Amino acid sequence: MYFICTYCNAYVYDESEGDPDTGLAPGTKVVEIPDEWRCPICGQPREYMQETSEEVFTEKRTRSKKRKDGPEPEKKDLVYYRAIARELLSGLCGVHPVCDGARDRVCSGQKYGKPLGVGGAGQGNTFHANYLALHKYKLKQRVVKEHFEPDMTTTVFGKEVVAPVLGCSMSGVKASMNDAIPEADFYRGLLRGAQEFGTIGLVGNTAAVPDHLGIDMVKENSGWGIAVFKPQSQLRLLELFELAEEYDAIAIGVDLDGCGSAIWAAKGKPVYRKSPNELKELVDSTSKPVFFKGIMTLEDALAVADSGAAGVYLSNHGGRVLDNGQGVVEILPDVAAELKGKLTIMVDGAIRTGFDVLKVIALGADTAHIGRPLLRMSLAGGADAVNMYYNYVKGDLRRAMIMTGCRTIGDATQEILISD
């Protein structure tokens, strides 16, 4: 009998053949598939397998074989790279049409001590809260004006970028991404793809590789990029800051919410909360712009400003360190009311499209940061795919600015928003 996974509508199974790649011997019936088995494409359990016709089975099998064995397609688009990412992240990420951390997503739910993959901490509520908070705001369509071509350019830490869109600082291929590619290649894709597009890439650091690999890759990229470090010991951070200055990085970041990192804890590498005095010491140690990431309250944002930092980065680590937290956008208006114009306000949190970018800019952000979509692109296609995704976002941002009457990024204010 023939079966198809009704979730991804791509994986097919013949009971007579079995599937050696997933450990199913010939003759294994669907009802006999072990509970721990997962669809190799979307990661769903056997309950999603339903009987199908021989015709559908053959068509799906032929299409899959052509993709694996045939020549590469002439046109490599986002759909092509997303399909590759779906295979690389099998069991961790379904590469769904909407990346929102909802309950029915492959990444969602408790992991019971296993690595988070690309999902959120606990039950994944904070990850989903990021999406919900952002989509409480709607864009106001305003079209009775003379036509114009929007100017999307802005300046970030003294560098002009083609749009206020940057990447998130990401790392952890071995622990969180099926060890799909080398960590250095992952960083390289993020940095070079951003540079080719005309913006600035960010990279993190992880416990599975030397903690200076990210800044080493920024050096390889001639200093065009930003390394963001976990809140390691103060002594080690000062050493990493010195390296970043030596390599002429654009700026330096510290991922304060990394103090809740399960990956670093599992590796026996301590990470720490940081006091206001420690923040100031880090800022004073370098001539480079410094920002602190992981800020989710106005109180913490004001402490960052008092340290002399050049930027405050509002983030809950993609919902990966604290469950049942607020969505990032929920705190943005209050922080912007106090700090807009005093330092760079950086924001992430389920930002996927140029329409999302315009919303957070209108709420007071200076830069909008994209995470999981760029993660998938760097794994699947390196710099080319990352650059392609940035251009996709830029196209949406251009359209959003035209439709809301924003000639420049500075014209995007709360006047173009409607909130639920």
Where are these regions (language model features)?
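The −1 position to Zn-ligating cysteines in a subset of zinc-ribbon hairpins
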Residues: I4, V12, R38
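Short, cysteine/histidine-rich loop/knuckle motifs that typically chelate Zn2+
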Residues: Y7, P40-I41
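Short, non-ligating residues that shape and space the ligands of small metal-coordination modules
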Residues: D14-E15, Y48-E51
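Short linker/helix segments within small regulatory modules
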Residues: D21-E36
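An N-cap/entry alpha-helix motif that binds or orients negatively charged groups
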Residues: R61-V161
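N-terminal functional module of multi-domain proteins
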Residues: T126-H212
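Alpha/beta enzyme core
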Residues: Q232-V347, F355-R372
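C-terminal helical cap(s) of enzyme catalytic domains, especially alpha/beta-barrels
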Residues: G268, N324-V335, M377-R398
